[in-house]
Amino acid sequence: MLTRNWPRHLLCLSLCLPLGSALACGPDFPMRLLDNRGQTLADLPEGNFNFELSRLGKAIAGLNNVTAATHNPNDLYGEENAAAEARDKAEQLGLSADQQTLVKQLRGLTDAHQVEVQGASLPAEIRLYVAGAVAFATGDHQLAVEYFNKLLALPADQRPLRSTWAAYSLGRTWFAMSSEAGDKVVALERSRDAFRQARQLSIDGFSDPLELGVASLGEEARVVRAAGDWNGAIELYEAQNLHGSAVGYTSLKQLMNELAELPEAELAELLQHTSVQQLVTASLVSRQGWSFGDEPPNEKKLVKLLQNSTRGSLENADRLAAMSYQQGDYAGAKAFLENAGDGGLAWWLRAKLAVRDGDKNAAAAAYSKAAQAFPQKEDWGYRRTPDWAYESLQPKCRVEGESAILALQRGEYLQAFVQLYRSNSTYWFDAATVAERVLTVEELKKYVDDNVPAPPALTQQERDNYVPLPVAASLRNLLGRRLLREGHYAEAVAYFDNPDLQNKARLYGEQRLKADSAWWPTKRASALYNAAWTAREWGMDILGYEMAPDYATFGGNFSLETTELTVGPLVSEAEVQRQKASEAKPDQRYHYRFVATELASRAADNLPHTSQAFAAVLCNAAGWNSSLEEQSALYQRYIKEGPYVLWAVDFGNQCPYPDFENADKRYVTQVT
């Protein structure tokens, strides 16, 4: 390949590459633990209400969890008649086509007695159930009770399809009658008995396609709540939630809202019950009802009454400690932690309190125990920070990330990096910062060589579908770019994650090495210019910093606010010096453009000033958008030193390729 055609071939290659995606507005950005280290260590993230509820209550032995048949928590916009359609579909199971048609006809009647007459050909359980359903729909609750009881009185082998249905409907009927009957207490008790029977029938294997066994928990909870038993209602809804019903979750949220509205005296009495205490605690540590950082109106009342009712409590002590810590009651948090045991949350709080007390050794030990105690898969879900960054909170990863802050302060830089890197993508921004700014290139390379093998390259289809790179590939790319920046050209190539990047890195490195070894000035100039062109065209991919100042992690499309790193309680002088030593040169956004311009200037240094190549190199470099100052300096250099050329009228915009071959001849002529 001729030297003068080299960038043209590269241009052809670049035009064949897919264009990067253009975003109309900025994306959400993940939280960075290292952005404000003191705040990170001081704050205890709010819990997740769904996760907190999963810790409460007891599942019913033998009762199956709900399936997709009745549970789709993501379907927020389901059809209003979806429940009726599901019932109609389930009602057809086990029936012949003629029986299905007849049941549909009977459902449309308004006289339950006519159901018995016209449905005489149906099995007794089907006929009795439809008759009871018609009676219920028309408001004849007493007649409905009679039909459902008749069905349940049949021998077990004669009612395999409708036993669970009948018991569940019987419970609903008695609940409706509780507002009509003279003895409300008796009606509610019979309703509760029926729902318990429905649950047991489901456990015993009677047909339950609508999963009424789980639904009965919520219905029974409603009965219990109507009888004034908040504690019992909460326990039933908790069980329903544990069996996978979204109704259990939403009902507990509603109960919590109702509790918050109660007068203080009534709420204080209810808070003597464990289940009420636990529900209120779960809500408070999860900050339910908060909006954009604004505290709900009843929050302080709930906190005060809960603290008054749980002093010295052994139950739920770690959550009570968390609630106290979030409220700024650190003495109260310490008191609860005395009885909080050795769970992950308890040790996390002890670590934070040790940081507050200035005991970093105790904090480090507590963080270590917290990381060991939290399950690997514990997930508190998605949250927003006060500055609207997002965090997918996995406590084990978060604890290790906070521990990394203390490791950095102690000078244990590799340990800090590993703790952040283990979070996978969650705290990648922090891991990347340590990898390219705090670790030496030798430390980083050794870790990658020993622990981060190259993952399989993404297929073209995966790239077309914007499948993100594995974090391992991102780390290896980061190392490859850093090696190129620091002059380790031959070593860098293998770390890039695909052949295209490897080829670009190889071309850049070859031209830099060629420039270093060339003894003839124009050959050196040609190689420097080609390296400069490569740096300008592909610098983000092969030279860019993952984080500041280039933000290769965003393809350079966005940048994040940064603050100058200064020595402080959590930042050592040694770390500051390491970060200064590894900062971009110059420390400007798209720093590789400045690298390209500097290489082009060096190319011009090796060319006869009267040559076309000298003018063309400066002209091209002036169009590389490094800065207005550099553009002006390049033009001024051309004015002072370069030859007159016609295309100088559009300097920096319309520039020919440098004619290095003729420059070589001119150089020989000038020398001789």
PLM regions and their residue ranges:
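Bacterial N-terminal signal peptides that target proteins for export
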Residues: 2-10
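Bacterial N-terminal signal peptides
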Residues: 10-20
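Extracytoplasmic/secretory-pathway proteins
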Residues: 23-150, 155, 159-169, 182-357, ...
